Amino acid sequence: MEYNFTGSSKPRRTINLSGEVQKPVSALAADARTQREDRRRQKLRNSAATRIQAAYRAYATSKAMRNTFAAEFDRLWQNSQRTPSDWVQLTRCLVMAHSRQPSKLHAHRMAAWANDVCGASLWTKPELHACNVLFFMVARRMIFALQYTPDLDVSDARAMILFLLWLQSDSYTTEEQRRAALYMLRFGLHSAIRQCILTFPKEATEECVALSLRPLVLFPEPTTEFAETLDESASASPRSIFIRSFVSDILTLPHLFYRVPISSVSLFASSFPLLDIMIHVQALGAYYDVVSGDSVLAHNPIHSPFLLGNILTIASRRINTMQSGTDVCHYLQMLATLQNALPTTTFDDHTTTVDPRTKKQIDNLISDQHIRSVLATSTRFAHSTRPALCTFLIATLCAWPVSVRDTLLISLLYAYDKEGSTRSMQIGSLVRELWRGWIRSSFLTRKMAVKEQNPGANVVAMRDALTNTAYAQDWTLFLTMCIVYGRCLVILGDDEFYPRESMDASMPTRNPLTMDELVVLSGLLRNLVFFMHWDNVGMTGDS
């Protein structure tokens, strides 16, 4: 060892005369990158800590300010002799004391303030109108409190509902009432009313119904415009915004008409904007793909079975009083849209997931009285309603179970007069009317009947007939006729289908189509079936 020769235990220093470094360049570069990354992360940590501390300080400061305004409100509220300026200051304190976390205490403050404001006689007219902006801000906070305050007292909620209704009363001009109604609609008025109806006892919901329908009086002009959004960026008309939120939040309530008193049900029936709602539901259906089941619109209300049940409760009683074929078409297309948007398990008693009360409402759609009314009303406007009727029938036949389909098909084999009583006519008159009045001369029939020398041309024509959306209406007519005529053939005897020459000529034949018409129809079906077999790539040879 070294110290045995030198007498020292200190290790000798290493002398590197060649100039070699102890670490390679790659290691030094890696160390530099590591140090740089550590400095960057430290800077990010410092920046994040600064933001967090700033946010906390802002939260603490705003909370202290809210507490200050709340204390000021409580102090001013103790004074029973309030001047108009005191009311203005109270309103400002009430607005500034509002928090994003709703509390029952602040909701109680707003309810007490609302009770006194609605009944205050010391407010002169100019000063009352000068506080409109503050009142709108209070209204927005009340709507928020009605939606999200847990265990809100019914008395406090009713006081806020009355204040929101007072803002749309005759205390203001018509223009001011409309501005208040539009402001509240954009900030979730119907969503707040929905929460109140769900939690209030039945006898306390009368004001809720009156408030939900008040915009109909302020915006009386019917509209066909569709509002996709309800926020401040919405550029649609006020009535379309009302219809959008009314359908989404009110008509989707479970057992709506069992949750409100009889007087409110009468108000619903008299004020119900059926035409606007029918057009709106069809617009909602345009955002839903029946084949794939995809919906472009978020939270599409047509997928709620309660919407179908609530609409049927009122609309089914108006079908006999409709005075135009356009209204009947809208009604039938609305029912088709709502049925297509629901799973088929909804309509089957054995697989349904809806409650018995809602199922009973939905069953009104296929009741004998409703079907008779639909057929009779469609007969009154046969020249314009048959395509919509077939759309409704196809949707109903596809949605409901087999037992309902059989009953419906039997009803379709017989015609109804304008009063809904059975006519003494030949069986299957609807088949004859559809074939001779609509299908025989349609573009779809001409497309399917093309006979070219080249078989490929026939295939191209049939493919176009099957895939072109321009023939959608013709297809519903054609399918309805084939389904009803197929059931007609089941119940006809041989002598009724092809009567003998010796039979009485005065007795009408029960076969709705002549032999020549049947030959043409058979040719169309043959071409259709052949193309479907030819074009199906996945079909095996055995099938």
Residue ranges and their predicted role:
Residues 2-4:
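Context-dependent free N-terminus signature
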Residues 80-543:
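Eukaryotic non-catalytic interaction scaffolds in large regulatory proteins
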Residues 11-87:
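Calmodulin-binding IQ motif alpha-helix
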